[in-house]
From Swiss-Prot:
It is a single-pass membrane protein. It is found in: Host membrane. This is Uncharacterized protein ORF12. Belongs to the plectrovirus ORF12 protein family. It comes from Spiroplasma virus SpV1-R8A2 B (SpV1). It comes from the Viruses. The chain crosses the membrane at residues 5-25.
Length: 49
């Protein structure tokens, strides 16, 4: 295999790993934000009673 091919493959693999971890972190942040919103909605419902 030529060297430029191996460099392209390695760059693609590194980018894929970064994207994978980025998506995982992004989903966790969204879940945390969603939970905070749920808590606020529950507090509003309780205060309305």
């Amino acid at each position: 295999m030529p060297t430029w091919l191996t460099t392209i493959f390695s760059v693609v693999i590194v980018l894929a790993i970064f994207l994978y971890f980025g998506l995982l972190i992004y989903q966790k942040i969204r879940q945390i934000r969603g939970k905070k919103k749920d808590k606020k909605e529950i507090e509003r419902k309780e205060s309305n009673k």
